[in-house]
């Protein structure tokens, strides 16, 4: 089997419009200058777009993944991949990983291509990807997460999650350390000792605040403290990890870079790794195995590719991971999002868990007529 074509398809949904992007805004009430993000309410509404990569073979098997790849990046992949066998997945990974510097691209740039190869290999074998890798669990528990809010807002979100059977919640908060402590205490008191709580202050703490808050989180039995400071400060994360017993998780803004992410774990600057299959399934699995040998976890960021399908597979294949990160308001939120582009079977949250389909490859089922009707560019 040989690769014959690599296509970058840009789809546009004329029935859905958005402003997209973020603006930078200052956090009020802090002595230091601290920023966060918000939307762009004055920006013109535009039709929503999404790109997909397709890898075609001479046996008629096609791998598909959503992507943020540029036409130039797709052309690099096309130049090197056409004529190669998709069974050379590891060799192609090594070539693009080691060659990243020489084509002047950011780390992880070819992740969608890697995902397409896994899709092809599963379809050729007649097996779901979870069977190719080796399944360790039939389904993965989810935690619900959302935006910055107040005590009532967090408790309301937790109740929404409970209605879906979800037993864990992750805060996002940009208020600064001292403002967060009474919120964490109040929510823990409200939900009781057995509900799982996690927090992600999104770089809104300094080191002193992170240590102070971290000790409170230990008292309140939180699962982990995520990205409390800007991740470029490795020495501060090393000090934080030494000071706390709660798991500290950095590397969300570094997770596209397999080498930097590995070094953070090796150098004791994080207790858990962050990963996202947007940067490739092979990369995620390599990081998971590295973490496993260090007695650490990898936690997957958001849905990955194909509206949760890819992370549903990987979460059921990786022993050292705890949760699927879910942002939805209803149990079928992922399915609704996928349906916009013709994906019919994005996973549901059922009894607080997510599970992959049993079809070959990623098991994605498509309304091909709808998918094709939305294509506005092909590269």
Q: What are these model-predicted stretches?
A:
Residues 1-59, 334-335, 340:
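Structured beta-strand/loop patches that form or line metal/cofactor-binding pockets in enzymes
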Residues 3, 60, 113, 126, ...:
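Conserved, mostly hydrophobic/aromatic
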Residues 32, 90, 215, 221, ...:
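Shared catalytic-loop signature of beta/alpha-barrel
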Residues 56-124:
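Metal- or metallocofactor-binding catalytic centers and their adjacent structured scaffolds
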Residues 58-64, 124-127, 132, 290, ...:
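Ligand-binding pocket scaffold of soluble enzyme catalytic domains
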Residues 65, 142-146, 169-171, 197-201, ...:
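Hydrophobic faces of well-ordered beta-strands that scaffold small-molecule active sites
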Residues 131-239, 243-244:
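Metal-dependent enolase-superfamily TIM-barrel catalytic cores that perform enediolate-based chemistry
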Residues 360-379:
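Extended hydrophobic packing segments that form well-structured cores
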